[in-house]
């Protein structure tokens, strides 16, 4: 079964995120468990945790179909010691919040070398950061998101993801979220049946489909190999609709969160309906 949703607002408290997801008829959702543009946040209140779990249960959202995303400020491969420590502290806090909410995943962007250290050194720091967070938590899986490769961000090559995973000690608690826009912008074509299959085979060969935990469903404003991260509504960008039709009919994407982060949140409900309508045999 396919579990499609969107990255919804948690304004007013995390307990509101499942309600926002239900309003757009989502079967999965993503959220920030704190303000994504601030380093610090007040601890989660017990009443918010209880209400979040109750609202998820009431609307049929299981933990494995919910994809929390960490703060955009965090850089787990930061070349400077003080900022690396700050990022690691914040990432650990995000992992703990996910545990408190009974969630299974934490989606994160790998990190950036900022032109100050080598790619290999940065990737090793990212893996070390993940290991430190996993050592201090019990159950949450660290889900690395592939990137478009904008600026000095790493994660745009499948080899980057593999190098991090290779250095993570607990392989049962690391996974990958593939973003269709990022994949395309990084130079992996998805537009035709043959290029779609070639890209997935490359991912399986280099990283392993066994590590795939989630997908971000986004069209791309920019073209193939642009290395620019600009999301577009489905079918309105350079990717087109065919890739999303293939994903919705591909058994490799069963039983995982398939999350919209498209440009216009006001049409997410229509996009979800569009995606489910793409399934062969759908009424």
From Swiss-Prot:
It catalyses: Endonucleolytic cleavage to 5'-phosphooligonucleotide end-products. Zn(2+) 1 binds at residues 69, 109, 145. Its EC number is 3.1.21.2. Keywords: DNA damage, DNA repair, Endonuclease, Hydrolase, Metal-binding, Nuclease, Zinc. InterPro entries: AP_endonuc_2, AP_endonuc_F2_Zn_BS, Xyl_isomerase-like_sf, Xyl_isomerase-like_TIM-brl. Zn(2+) 2 binds at residues 145, 179, 216, 261. PROSITE patterns: AP_NUCLEASE_F2_1, AP_NUCLEASE_F2_2, AP_NUCLEASE_F2_3, AP_NUCLEASE_F2_4. GO terms for molecular function: deoxyribonuclease IV (phage-T4-induced) activity; DNA binding; DNA-(apurinic or apyrimidinic site) endonuclease activity; phosphoric diester hydrolase activity; zinc ion binding. Binds 3 Zn(2+) ions. Pfam families: AP_endonuc_2 (PF01261). It comes from the Bacteria. Signal peptide: none annotated. Its cofactor is Zn(2+). It is an enzyme of class 3 (hydrolase). Zn(2+) 3 binds at residues 182, 229, 231. GO terms for biological process: base-excision repair. Belongs to the AP endonuclease 2 family. NCBIfam families: nfo, PRK01060.1-4. Endonuclease IV plays a role in DNA repair. It cleaves phosphodiester bonds at apurinic or apyrimidinic (AP) sites, generating a 3'-hydroxyl group and a 5'-terminal sugar phosphate. This is Probable endonuclease 4. The lineage of its organism: Bacteria, Pseudomonadati, Thermodesulfobacteriota, Desulfobacteria, Desulfobacterales.
């Amino acid at each position: 079964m396919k579990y499609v949703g969107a990255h919804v607002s948690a304004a007013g408290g995390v307990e509101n995120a499942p309600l926002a997801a239900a309003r757009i008829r989502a079967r999965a959702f993503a959220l920030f468990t704190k303000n994504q543009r601030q380093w610090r946040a007040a601890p989660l209140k017990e009443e918010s945790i209880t209400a979040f779990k109750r609202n998820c249960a009431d609307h049929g959202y299981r933990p494995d179909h919910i994809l929390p995303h960490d703060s955009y400020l965090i850089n787990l491969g930061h070349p400077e010691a003080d900022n690396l420590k700050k990022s690691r502290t914040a990432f650990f806090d995000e992992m703990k919040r996910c545990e408190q909410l009974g969630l299974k995943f934490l989606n994160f962007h790998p990190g950036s070398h900022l032109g100050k250290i080598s790619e290999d050194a940065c990737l090793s720091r990212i893996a070390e950061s993940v290991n430190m967070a996993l050592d201090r938590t019990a159950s949450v899986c660290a889900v690395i998101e592939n990137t478009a490769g904008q600026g000095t961000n790493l994660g745009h090559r499948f080899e980057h993801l593999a190098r991090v995973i290779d250095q993570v000690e607990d392989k049962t608690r690391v996974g990958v979220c593939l973003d269709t826009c990022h994949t395309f912008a990084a130079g992996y074509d998805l537009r035709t049946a043959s290029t779609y299959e070639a890209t997935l085979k490359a991912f399986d060969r280099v990283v392993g489909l066994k590590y795939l935990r989630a997908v971000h469903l986004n069209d791309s404003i920019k073209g193939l190999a642009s290395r620019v991260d600009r999301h577009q509504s489905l079918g309105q960008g350079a990717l087109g609709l065919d890739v999303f039709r293939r994903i919705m009919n591909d058994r490799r994407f069963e039983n995982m969160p398939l999350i919209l982060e498209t440009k216009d949140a006001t049409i997410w409900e229509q996009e979800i309906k569009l995606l489910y309508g793409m399934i062969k045999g759908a009424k």
